[in-house]
Amino acid sequence: MEYIIAVYRSRNVSMRVYNYLVGQNQVCAIVSTPQGAGVGCGLSVKFSHTTLNGYGHIISQAETFVGFFLVKTTLRGTTITRL
């Protein structure tokens, strides 16, 4: 399984970005920020590569934005890579 998370330093901003994406009919979710990201407020917005391609530029301009991370889960565990 593979997905993208957008990490912010503010829970409020994470929720606003989530609400924006839902309003744009994008499939997304609020998730706990993985420890491997090493930053953030504890909440991140999870979405697909397609959403990143279409809305990445817009949501990266929100205040307190830390970065995008690729999360891959396999039988061997989870890896987190900063994009």
Cite the ranges covered by each PLM segment:
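C-terminal structural segments of small proteins and small subunits
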Residues: L52-L83
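Amphipathic, hydrophobic secondary-structure cores in small proteins
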Residues: E2-I5, R9, V17-S48
